[in-house]
Amino acid sequence: MKKNKYGFLIRFLMKICLWGVAFFLILTYVIGFFRATGNSMFPSIKDGDLCILYKIEESHTNDIVLYKTSDGKERLGRIVAVGEQKVNFPEEGGYTVNDYQPAEEITYETYRAEKSDMKYPITLEKDEYFILNDYRSDTSDSREYGVVKKEDIEGKLIFILRRRGF
């Protein structure tokens, strides 16, 4: 009789451990969380928003992604150009990808970063991305840090939980 009681307890603990391992693996390799700080992605993402990221899917133009900068910081940004595309910032403002102005829902004033050593036009290598903030006055994106490599992209934004207002 005692053997059955302990057998049930062992099976129960094994199930809890299995669920715990599965939950850990999902949170480590599939889904990620990031709390947005600052207004670099305003109006899309506001300061304090909780961002839910999908880590497996390939990133494409216009996706909002979490990436690591050359100095190790994690930042959110929008992909505006992908591998083997040419990006330029004309003197009069704006930017072009393959000599065309990309269509955007909201038109943002976009200029080169003043404190950057980047030379334009720049042609991206395969598995490189050019990322801009939605709040383009904040130039702490590819204009300042340079192109982002595929391995530096940590995940693609799939959902936002607003923490303040709507």
Describe these PLM feature segments:
Residues 2-10, 14, 29-35, 43-166:
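Soluble "head" domains of membrane/secretory-pathway proteins
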